[in-house]
Regions:
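Short, glycine-/polar-rich solvent-exposed loops and beta-turns at beta-strand/coil boundaries
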Residues: 63-75, 101-104, 133-137
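Transmembrane beta-barrel outer-membrane domains
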Residues: 72, 111, 134, 161-165, ...
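N-terminal periplasmic "start-of-domain" segments of outer-membrane beta-barrel proteins
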Residues: 19-49, 78, 86
Length: 240
């Protein structure tokens, strides 16, 4: 069970150029001016992917990453940068550093991040320890959840697959000159496949995720943002 809450004061950024939220200078800048190797998974790439989870989507880019998963959906998964163990890749969600308190090394687990609530993921590859600490020797990953866009939108997205797999995503969002908001709910269920040979018992997985973001623009230089993300996962697994 994971709850993430953050309140961030950010300068308002121009929207007419590609923006990298994390960078060696910790300042937003265009991709073309970042002096290190960068991969961006934008909204278009996320929507076109057939994967349910962000970690699977990112792992499909084998030219940039090494990804692993210890089993089926819901089992521990991670992203390795520059061939280093995942503990050397620092992960942020909406600018807040993430870690897994249940892990001895604090490695971040990608297994519960469903893609439909994510706006983009930005990856800096190579040593970023001078900026983000020793945990960023391999690089840094910043995950950005969705925010409201001008007007009012309601979205429903449903996908199904084999082994009793279903994915439902609901959201509503909007923005005006001062305010923006996004509220999203996503549910993923699957009967799974047993990790043991000759075993008819399946390893089921359930995931419920809620994202709620609100922003208020005071002026052209100051904006306050509140970000809440709650993810609950339930996994059945075999003891070999």
């Amino acid at each position: 069970f994971l709850i993430i809450f953050s309140m961030i004061l950010n300068p308002v950024l121009a929207e007419d150029i590609p923006i990298i939220v994390i960078s060696p200078s910790q300042k937003a800048q265009s991709k073309s001016t970042v002096g290190t190797s960068v991969t961006v998974f934008d909204q278009s790439k996320i929507e076109k992917s057939n994967d349910f989870f962000l970690g699977d989507l990112m792992g499909s880019d084998t030219t940039s990453f090494n990804s692993f998963q210890s089993g089926g959906y819901g089992s521990a998964s991670g992203i390795q940068l520059r061939g280093l163990p995942k503990r050397y890749s620092t992960v942020f969600i909406d600018g807040v550093k993430q870690s897994d308190p249940s892990s001895v090394s604090g490695d971040f687990d990608f297994s519960h991040i469903l893609k439909n609530q994510i706006s983009r993921a930005e990856v800096l590859k190579g040593n970023q320890s001078s900026v983000y600490g020793s945990g960023a020797i391999g690089g840094a990953i910043n995950i950005v959840t969705k925010r409201g866009q001008p007007g009012f939108q309601k979205n429903i997205n449903y996908n199904t697959a084999s082994h009793g797999t279903h994915n439902l995503a609901l959201s509503m969002s909007g923005a005006d000159d001062k305010n923006d908001f996004y509220i999203g709910y996503e549910r993923f269920v699957t009967d799974g496949i047993s990790a043991m040979d000759n075993n008819d018992e399946e390893d089921a997985y359930r995931n419920n995720t809620i994202v709620a973001n609100y922003g208020y623009k005071f002026n052209d230089k100051l904006k306050i943002e509140n970000n809440v993300r709650v993810a609950q996962g339930y996994l059945q697994y075999d003891t070999l």
